[in-house]
């Protein structure tokens, strides 16, 4: 399963740096110039993987504990 990167707004659980999930109160920001994505303070929501509205990837249960 492929998980998408995250941007601000909405939910506070998102995938960051491959399989690392940003927890409560954090969001994932995309790295630039070859830098890795980072978890920072703020909420995040998954980006859709396709062009269909609302087509978001789910976060596995094991990450939500």
Swiss-Prot record:
Keywords: Disulfide bond, Glycoprotein, Protease inhibitor, Secreted, Serine protease inhibitor, Sulfation
GO cellular component, one term: extracellular region
Annotated stretches, region: Disordered: 39-65
Any single Pfam family the record assigns to this protein: Hirudin
Glycosylated residues (UniProt): 45
A molecular function (GO) term: serine-type endopeptidase inhibitor activity
Region listing for Interaction with thrombin active site, in residue ranges: 1-3
Superkingdom as given in the UniProt entry: Eukaryota
Acidic residues: compositionally biased ranges: 55-65
Chain positions with Sulfotyrosine modification: 63
Disulphide bond pairs: 6-14, 16-28, 22-39
Record localization: Secreted
Matches recorded under SUPFAM superfamilies: Leech antihemostatic proteins (SSF57262)
Annotated region (Interaction with fibrinogen-binding exosite of thrombin), positions in chain: 55-65
Signal peptide: none
Similarity comment: family membership: Belongs to the protease inhibitor I14 (hirudin) family.
Function: Hirudin is a potent thrombin-specific protease inhibitor. It forms a stable non-covalent complex with alpha-thrombin, thereby abolishing its ability to cleave fibrinogen.
Name of the protein this chain belongs to: Hirudin-3A
């Amino acid at each position: 399963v492929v998980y998408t990167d995250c941007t601000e707004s909405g939910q506070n659980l998102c995938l960051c740096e491959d399989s690392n999930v940003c927890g409560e109160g954090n969001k994932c920001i995309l790295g630039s110039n070859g830098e890795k994505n980072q978890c920072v303070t703020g909420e995040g929501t998954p980006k859709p993987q396709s062009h269909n509205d609302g087509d978001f990837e789910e976060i596995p249960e094991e990450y939500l504990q």
